[in-house]
């Protein structure tokens, strides 16, 4: 419901590698200039040292309803998750725990989770008291329609705290089950959660590891815990292989290798599952612009160029090839623009992106003649995943055409800039970082 860290960071003060102190963003909602704040958040200390942060804050909510939904099949719990989101309901939390985690938590805290359940969901909604009960009842209906065995509401703050104690203490409770555990942190589209959980179980069985699942189901962020003993060198090798295969499986399902734990060194080689060498070249160029001497947290995130990676090329999964094909297809549709840019660069000409021309009056006149680049040929829907509420469209698609496509599925892009009309392109929306009156509903 509230998004991730970058949605709440308004501004930063940071020290660059040469000692210069700079500010990015600030308390104003729409600072001018490039969004360096967005570049810094998530950079893992590789671009600068943050010394001061301005964040967005919210008032405490008026009412909270916390529910515990019980399931006999973990796949049914996963179905409830994406059906709730697909219904247009955004709980502030949707957390899942499977049978192994339930037992571990009950042994440690006695939270009242049913030990015979295959999975439980902790679902919490909050907001004004008026209407909140209706939202909770709709969630309960969806859960029962997806084979929930039982669902109950916490009666008071003490009961709510007890439910949350189990979730907060889950990792500590699991520590009693084995000398060590490997925490995976990969993400899949919500509709792929049942399949992802099946593959996690299959991989764990393949290598002979017990696995427990406790994770942020609402955004598809998996946390399989593989139990092992690091004193056993074979287990240590095998658990790394299993973790790698779980990441591969998530990428195969349209997900990614990390949801919130970052990349650092541990997942550096796995970056090749989701990025091409051209992608890395761009990221290395950004790193070099901030840190040309490579003094800040060197060697993190981006794998080195060449053949220095830990994983052999044969282990890189098929989705990279699929993505390469997708890029090839995109390049084919964008070929005229690519050719125009190459030609302009060779002749040292300036270029100016153009859509339908409806917003050409924004900004100042070019300081020198510029070659227009027409994006209107890029007007198709590239991929539309309605259940996961994601659409990818060409930059030349008009705002009106996009909204019309979405409305056929009872969806919309929640932006209505006052100066926009149906013929304006999505590219212009991005270029101007345009916003509308609904921004306040999304924490804006």
Label the model's feature ranges.
Residues 1-95, 296, 314-319, 415-416, ...:
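FAD-binding subdomain of flavoenzyme oxidoreductases
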Residues 5, 29-30, 53-59, 111-112, ...:
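A glycine- and small-aliphatic-rich helix-loop capping segment at beta-alpha/alpha-beta transitions
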Residues 55-59, 65-242, 249, 253:
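C-terminal substrate-recognition/cap domain of FAD-linked oxidoreductases
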Residues 95-107, 153-167, 216-221, 260-270, ...:
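A glycine-rich phosphate-binding loop feature that marks nucleotide/adenosyl-phosphate handling sites
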Residues 216, 227, 250, 330-385, ...:
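Glycine-rich N-terminal segment of FAD-binding domains in flavoprotein oxidoreductases
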Residues 251-263, 288, 292-296:
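Alpha-helix capping/hinge segments and adjacent helical runs
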Residues 276-337, 348:
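Intrinsic disorder at enzyme termini
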């Amino acid at each position: 419901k509230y998004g991730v860290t970058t949605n709440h960071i308004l501004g930063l003060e940071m020290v660059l590698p040469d000692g210069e102190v700079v500010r990015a963003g600030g308390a104003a909602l729409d600072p001018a200039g490039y969004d360096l704040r967005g570049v810094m958040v998530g950079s893992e200390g590789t671009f600068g040292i943050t010394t001061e942060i301005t964040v967005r804050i919210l008032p405490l909510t008026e009412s909270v309803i916390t529910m515990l939904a019980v399931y006999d099949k973990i796949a049914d719990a996963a179905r409830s998750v994406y059906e709730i989101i697909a219904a247009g309901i955004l709980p502030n939390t949707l957390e899942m725990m499977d049978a192994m985690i339930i037992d571990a938590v009950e042994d440690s805290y006695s939270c009242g989770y049913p030990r015979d359940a295959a999975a439980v969901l902790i679902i919490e909604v909050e907001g004004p008291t008026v209407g909140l009960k209706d939202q909770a009842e709709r969630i309960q209906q969806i859960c029962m329609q997806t084979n929930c065995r039982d669902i109950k509401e916490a009666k008071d703050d003490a009961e709510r705290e007890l439910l949350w104690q189990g979730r907060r203490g889950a990792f500590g409770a699991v520590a009693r089950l084995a000398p060590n555990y490997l925490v995976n942190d990969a993400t899949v589209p919500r509709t792929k959660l049942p399949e992802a959980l099946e593959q996690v179980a299959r991989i764990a069985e393949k290598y002979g590891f017990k696995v427990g699942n406790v994770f942020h189901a609402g955004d598809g962020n998996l946390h399989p815990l593989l139990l092992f003993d690091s004193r056993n060198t074979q287990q240590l090798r095998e658990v790394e292989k299993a973790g790698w295969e779980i990441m591969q499986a998530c990428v195969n399902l349209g997900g990614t290798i990390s949801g919130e734990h970052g990349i650092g060194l541990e997942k550096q080689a796995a970056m090749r599952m989701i990025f091409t060498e051209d992608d890395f070249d761009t990221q290395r160029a950004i790193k070099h612009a901030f840190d040309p001497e490579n003094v800040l947290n060197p060697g993190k995130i981006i794998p080195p160029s060449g053949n220095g990676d830990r994983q052999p090329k044969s282990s890189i999964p098929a989705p990279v090839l699929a993505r390469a094909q997708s890029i090839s297809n995109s390049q084919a549709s964008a070929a005229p623009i690519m050719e125009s840019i190459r030609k302009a660069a060779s002749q040292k000409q300036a270029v100016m992106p153009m859509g339908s021309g409806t917003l050409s009056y924004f900004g100042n006149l070019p300081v020198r003649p510029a070659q227009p680049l027409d994006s209107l040929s890029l007007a198709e829907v590239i991929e539309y995943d309605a259940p996961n509420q994601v659409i990818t469209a060409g930059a030349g698609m008009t705002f009106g055409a996009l909204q019309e496509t979405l409305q056929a599925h009872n969806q919309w892009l929640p932006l209505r800039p006052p100066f926009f009309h149906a013929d304006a392109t999505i590219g212009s929306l991005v270029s101007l970082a345009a916003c509308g009156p609904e921004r306040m509903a999304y924490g804006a």
